[in-house]
């Protein structure tokens, strides 16, 4: 499947709710460990969220994560108008330990 970057900006009053949903995805990924996926989410100072997913497996293992389904429900309504999820295929040009496993994660 490759690398995908998704960018969106929730409404200010829904950003913490969105973060809670994202954290639940990571908690379930940690307990299920579906393999074939590397995934990171960043929250920028302006409230924008950026998700970076490197999916090796086909089909996408995130489709089997219940918390991911809950996160996706209502995502457009949580976002500012015109700031909904914008997924784009991406190519990693360079990385210094970013996609490597870390004992501090």
Please identify what each model-predicted range represents.
Residues 9-20:
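Short, surface-exposed ligand-recognition loops at beta-strand->loop->(often short) alpha-helix junctions
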């Amino acid at each position: 499947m490759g690398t995908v970057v998704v960018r969106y900006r929730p409404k200010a009053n829904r950003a913490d709710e969105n973060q809670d949903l994202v954290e639940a995805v990571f908690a379930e990924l940690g307990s299920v460990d579906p393999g074939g996926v590397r995934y990171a989410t960043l929250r920028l100072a302006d409230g924008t969220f950026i998700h970076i997913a490197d999916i090796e497996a086909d089909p996408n293992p995130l489709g089997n994560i219940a918390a991911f389904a809950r996160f996706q429900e209502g995502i457009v309504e949580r976002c500012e108008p015109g700031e909904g999820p914008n997924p784009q295929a991406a190519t990693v040009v360079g990385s210094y330990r970013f996609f490597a496993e870390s004992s501090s994660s």
